[in-house]
């Protein structure tokens, strides 16, 4: 077998392979034997059909099978022998073949780039340092109380955390607009559900009052015809209700987990907060590392790998919005190409970090990660056992752990500064 490899544009390569005639003929004879064993021809018993008839009937198909198999086999022999880092599927073009002669073909394909990491020492990472305080715990307890809150009607003026029932009619330049009108609309204030200025305009008014609120729709508002427009809402305030928070009793505490006292509840809450905080900090640092790698290493990526990632993103989009799987192909590829390219680049860069640092998965850390995940459930032991019985899930955790190890390897060379931050600051800036 003779080969020649050419470098085309970018990451494209072309290999020309010639397979010796005797190898093709040997494969051809084996194919005919296979056909002969199963051929059914009138006047002959199965497996006893003369060779000349088998060749006459099946010779062309047998040659095509052999040539197709040899292209696949010979190409991947080249990939292994030449240590080609193949990306995607090759395109085969066979040359004209005459029985008894050598067979040659051309395979065109893409390769993954050879990544040489640069600028790790230029990557800047700000690492928040957070201590969960008693005030943080108090806020979280209040969140739980608000989840169990009731409301009591009042004749007092509406406050920022009250619940109100209103009728409203919105208009722009004196004309009502679609979706700007509602009756008996119940609004829990202080949750940011309405556009800026709307809830603030209700505060201070009492049930039975009618008044107008002047607001400006945000520039990024979803309705194109309302972006940045000044609007007026005519409001009828029909009911004001004060929020009534439940007392911190044993009965209240028992609604949340296994805690029996307020102190036990606070301990459980703190554990959950610590777990959420750890995940948020890990994600924030990882994102900075990845952004730094991308900024310092502008690598070319195979179009085939990007296309595969586009398909993954399409499927995820369909699943997210509850569509049917066959709808994925209808989504325009250009919607996902930027993110797909970024994902491929990130994968290649992290793989290079892993390879250059000779990183191996820390199995103890894998077990710790699974235990941490399990601790969020009522029956942690069952979750751990479930992972043990599902190798694919465990492999996913291994990939996560190895990626974390890669991030830490970059951090060891990057410029890392610590910054004192609060729990709320970190949790409000996720993503």
Curated annotation (Swiss-Prot):
E.C. number(s) listed in UniProt: 5.2.1.8
Entry annotated with the keyword Transcription regulation: no
UniProt-annotated location(s): Cytoplasm
One MF annotation (Gene Ontology) recorded for this entry: protein folding chaperone
UniProt KW keywords: Cell cycle, Cell division, Chaperone, Cytoplasm, Isomerase, Rotamase
Record has Cell membrane as a keyword: no
Enzymatic reactions: [protein]-peptidylproline (omega=180) = [protein]-peptidylproline (omega=0)
Family membership: Belongs to the FKBP-type PPIase family. Tig subfamily.
Function recorded in the entry: Involved in protein export. Acts as a chaperone by maintaining the newly synthesized protein in an open conformation. Functions as a peptidyl-prolyl cis-trans isomerase.
UniProt domain comment: Consists of 3 domains; the N-terminus binds the ribosome, the middle domain has PPIase activity, while the C-terminus has intrinsic chaperone activity on its own.
Name of the featured protein: Trigger factor
Annotated source species: Glaesserella parasuis serovar 5 (strain SH0165)
Gene for this chain: tig
């Amino acid at each position: 077998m003779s080969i020649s490899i050419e470098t085309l544009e970018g990451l494209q390569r072309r290999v020309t392979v010639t397979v010796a005639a005797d190898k093709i003929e040997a494969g051809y004879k084996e194919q005919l034997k296979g056909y002969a064993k199963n051929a059914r021809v009138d006047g002959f018993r199965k497996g006893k059909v003369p060779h000349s008839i088998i060749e006459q009937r099946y010779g062309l198909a047998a040659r095509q099978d052999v040539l197709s198999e040899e292209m696949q086999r010979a190409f991947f022999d080249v990939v292994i022998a030449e240590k080609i880092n193949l990306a995607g599927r090759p395109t085969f073009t066979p040359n004209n073949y005459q029985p008894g002669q050598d067979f040659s073909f051309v395979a065109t394909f893409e390769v993954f780039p050879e990544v040489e990491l640069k600028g790790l020492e230029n990557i800047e990472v700000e690492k928040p340092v957070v201590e969960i305080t008693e005030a943080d715990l108090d806020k979280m307890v209040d969140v739980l109380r608000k989840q169990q809150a009731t409301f009591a009607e009042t004749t007092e003026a509406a406050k920022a955390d009250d619940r109100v029932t209103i009728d409203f009619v919105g208009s722009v330049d004196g004309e009502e607009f679609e979706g700007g009108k509602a009756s008996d609309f119940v609004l829990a204030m202080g949750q940011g559900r309405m556009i800026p200025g709307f809830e603030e305009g209700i505060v201070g008014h009492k049930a039975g009052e009618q008044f107008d609120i002047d607001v400006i729709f945000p520039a990024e508002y979803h309705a194109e015809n309302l972006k940045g427009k000044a609007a007026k809402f005519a409001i009828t305030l029909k009911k004001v209700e004060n929020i009534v928070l439940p007392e911190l009793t044993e009965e209240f505490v028992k609604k949340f987990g296994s805690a029996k006292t307020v102190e036990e509840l606070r301990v459980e809450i703190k554990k959950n907060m610590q777990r959420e905080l750890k995940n948020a900090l890990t994600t924030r640092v990882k994102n900075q590392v990845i952004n730094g790698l991308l900024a310092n290493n502008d690598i070319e990526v195979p179009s085939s790998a990007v296309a595969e990632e586009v398909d993954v993103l399409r499927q995820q989009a369909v699943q997210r919005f509850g569509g049917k799987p066959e709808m994925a192909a209808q989504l325009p590829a250009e919607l996902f190409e930027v993110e797909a390219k970024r994902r491929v680049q990130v994968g290649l860069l992290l793989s290079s970090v892993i390879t250059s640092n000779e990183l191996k998965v820390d199995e103890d850390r894998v077990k710790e990660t699974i235990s941490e995940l399990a601790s969020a459930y009522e029956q942690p032991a069952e979750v751990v056992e479930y992972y043990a019985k599902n190798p694919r899930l465990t492999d996913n955790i291994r990939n996560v752990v190895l990626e974390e190890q890669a991030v830490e390897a970059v951090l060891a060379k990057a410029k890392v500064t610590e910054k004192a931050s609060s729990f709320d600051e970190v949790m409000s800036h996720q993503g």
